[in-house]
Structure formats: structure tokens, C-alpha cells
Amino acid sequence: MRFGVEFEEGIFDKICDLLKQCENKELKMEELLRLSLENGISSSDYLFLVLQELSSKKLIESSRGTVKIGKLSQEFEEIKKKVAERIKKIKKVFVTPLEIAKFYQCPRRLWLEKVVQSKQEKEKVGKVWDGEAVHLAVKLMIESVQKEKDENFLVLKACEEAFKKYEGMIQIEKRTLEEFLRKFLELIKEENFNFVYSERTIESLREGIIGSVDVIGVKNDEIVPIEIKYAAFKGRIKKEHLLQAIGETILVGNYFRKDVKYSFLVYFQTNSLIKVEVDEDLVRQFFKLKKQLEKFYSLGRIPPKSKLPNYTKRVCQGCHVKRACDNIEILRRMIRKI
């Protein structure tokens, strides 16, 4: 969570380098956006601001989803200043889809984690690190999937490196992780993705959202975000998981300037694959929660605890800032007695 935008010169330089590589070429806009993602350009809003300036100087032409890049001049310094000025005027609260999901669960928990930055007490061995190992293994596998054709080698290598990094901290069995990775590869093949990316940070300056999407699949005219959950699927998707998935579809859709029709939730413990259709009502709920979050934290008060049914088990039990929250409640009881 953060307020406003700082102009990132590194992203601007990456855009300039990419456009120079594409001089005297005509590209589909989708291809240019994909190349931007591959080159670590986290926000396509930066790219479009630069393209607008180049278009005003008649250095590029665009029509019907294509862009023709001419011979670029040495005017990037002037363009940089103009783009920087426009970006510095953006006064929004930027949140991640995961933070919206956490806010839905418990406003106070997110406040303690992100605003107060209370000490988080994480277990030294167990679920937290099991989840980290699963995500790392998927990331390593995806990064090599288009280079290495031996799927068995891909799975074993990714699994081995994840276990090596989290040695002594995880409880999952290697065979279980290997089976999960193989099934994940099947999903990629069945969906017939042309390109697959893992843990790419994406930012929407327009919507005030930033986040790292576990996996993004690209095929023909479709973009599909995939969120991996270490949890078990018990027949019904939790609302917080839906909100995170919807937030990621908004992020990815904004980046590629496309309507994302669906995403996937993949549950590790039950090896379940759930397709999440984009629901406009959920999109409205996501932005409503974002506004509530901004209002809560601008008041400078301690937010309330979770109001979800059975929240003590559902939210408090695994909370990393439970001790800080308990101390707030103890202090409040003491004040009431005075």
C-alpha cells in the first residue's frame, strides 16, 4: 500500500530501449505490450504516455490495434520530463489485490501489517513456508518451460531448488509437489498458451492497483491470470480469494487493454483447479472495498476487527499480528474501567 506515484526512470529507460529496438517496424499493440511485460515494464500506462508524446511529434503511427514506429529522434529527454510531470500529479492510494482481500477479512489486520507495520510473528516451520516453496517451484518451472522440452527434468529441477532454499522450514513431501507441478504443466498445455509468465509485477496508474500475479497465460486474443493458493478447496471459493482473483483480472486487463473473461484459482492441498468468470458485481465490490480502505486509513483511527462469521477461527487463528491486536483490545478494556 502506498500513496501517489514516484516517476521511475528505470522503467522509462526500458521503454526507450524497447522502442529503439522496434524502429521502422509495424507491430500489433498486443505484441508490443507483451514485449513490454517481458522487458520488466511494470505499467503499460508509462508506455502509452510515451507513445502519446511520440505520436504528437509524428514519430509513430497507430491504427486498428497496430503501431508503426518510425526513426526515433534524440528527443527522449524532453519526453521524459513531460511524462514525469504527468505522473507526479497522480494522487491515488495504490493497493494490491491481496490487500483488498485482507481488508475484506479484517480491516485491523491490514492496518497493523501495512500502516503501523507491527512485528509479524511467523512460524519457523510449516504452512507459510510450504506456500513459499510451492510458489517458488512454479516460478522456476515457468521461467524455463519455453526453453526446456524435457518436462520431467523441469519438474524435478524446480522441485529440488525449492526444497534446497527452504530446507528445514517446510513439511510438504517432495513427491506431492512434483505431482502438483506436473498437473500445472497439463493446465498450460490444455489451455494452449502461446506465452506464460510468472510473478510479474504489474501496476495500473489509472486504477491505483499494483500487484504480482502468480502466472499470466497469453493465447490468441485472451489473457488469463492464474492465482495459486496453498490452501485446500472445500467445495466453495472463499470471498477473499474471489476478490483477489478479480483484482488480478483488473490489473492484467488494464495492462493489455483487454477485457479479461476469466481467471484460474489453483489449490495446492487438494490439487483443485477452479475457473473464475469475471463478475461485474464482484468488480464493483472490489472498488467499493478499495474506497472503504482509503477512507478508513485516512481517518487516523484504529480500524475495527473482522466482522466475518466465525472470524476468530477463520481470520485470527493464523494471523501474524494477533499479539498486537490483542494488546489493543486489552488497552481498550483498561481505559473503559478508568
Report residues per predicted region:
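Metal-dependent nuclease catalytic regions and adjoining charged, substrate-binding loops involved
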Residues: 2-7, 43-46, 69-77, 205-208, ...
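A general structural-boundary detector
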Residues: 18-19, 121, 125, 202, ...
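Mg2+/Mn2+-dependent nuclease catalytic core
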Residues: 34-38, 185-295
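Metal-dependent nuclease catalytic cores that hydrolyze phosphodiester bonds in DNA/RNA
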Residues: 2-52, 59-218, 338
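Short, charged/polar micro-motifs that form catalytic or ligand-binding hotspots
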Residues: 40, 124, 128, 234-239, ...
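Short alpha-helical basic/polar micro-motif
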Residues: 52, 246, 317
